[in-house]
């Protein structure tokens, strides 16, 4: 697996919401959905390499999937993992840019 494949297997998508927008403004933190097997070191390396920024800290949260029903059938959404990435002062990422 080359380095680009490794990066995109670790980082799945940025999470964009009111909460994440507030974190970006106040504490220079960005939130990404990451692979369930990704470690903090993997996330840090992937963000630094992909966006060419300096990462100060990474916090990771395991999010449990919700129980949902559809037409009287019970189902469960999958568990996923998100990473809060704090960048060094003066650096930023444009997560709304189109690929």
Swiss-Prot record:
Pfam families from the UniProt entry: Ribosomal_L23
Key words, A-Z: Ribonucleoprotein, Ribosomal protein, RNA-binding, rRNA-binding
InterPro entries: Nucleotide-bd_a/b_plait_sf, Ribosomal_uL23-like, Ribosomal_uL23/eL15/eS24_sf, Ribosomal_uL23_CS
Highest rank taxon of the organism: Bacteria
Any single Gene Ontology cellular-component annotation: ribosome
PROSITE patterns per record: RIBOSOMAL_L23 (PS00050)
Single GO biological process annotation from the record: translation
GO MF terms, alphabetically ordered: rRNA binding; structural constituent of ribosome
General function of this protein: One of the early assembly proteins it binds 23S rRNA. One of the proteins that surrounds the polypeptide exit tunnel on the outside of the ribosome. Forms the main docking site for trigger factor binding to the ribosome.
Similarity-based family: Belongs to the universal ribosomal protein uL23 family.
Subunit structure: Part of the 50S ribosomal subunit. Contacts protein L29, and trigger factor when it is bound to the ribosome.
Protein name: Large ribosomal subunit protein uL23
Source species of the chain: Stenotrophomonas maltophilia (strain K279a)
Gene: rplW
């Amino acid at each position: 697996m080359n380095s680009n494949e490794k990066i995109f297997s670790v980082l799945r998508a940025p999470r964009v919401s009111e909460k994440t927008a507030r974190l970006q403004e106040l504490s220079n933190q960005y939130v990404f959905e990451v692979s369930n097997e990704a470690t903090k070191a993997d996330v840090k390396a992937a963000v630094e390499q992909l966006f060419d920024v300096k990462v100060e800290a990474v916090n990771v949260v395991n999010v449990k999937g919700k129980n949902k029903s559809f037409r009287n059938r019970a189902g469960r959404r999958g568990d996923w993992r998100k990473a809060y990435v704090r960048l060094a002062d003066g650096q930023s990422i444009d997560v709304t840019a189109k690929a």
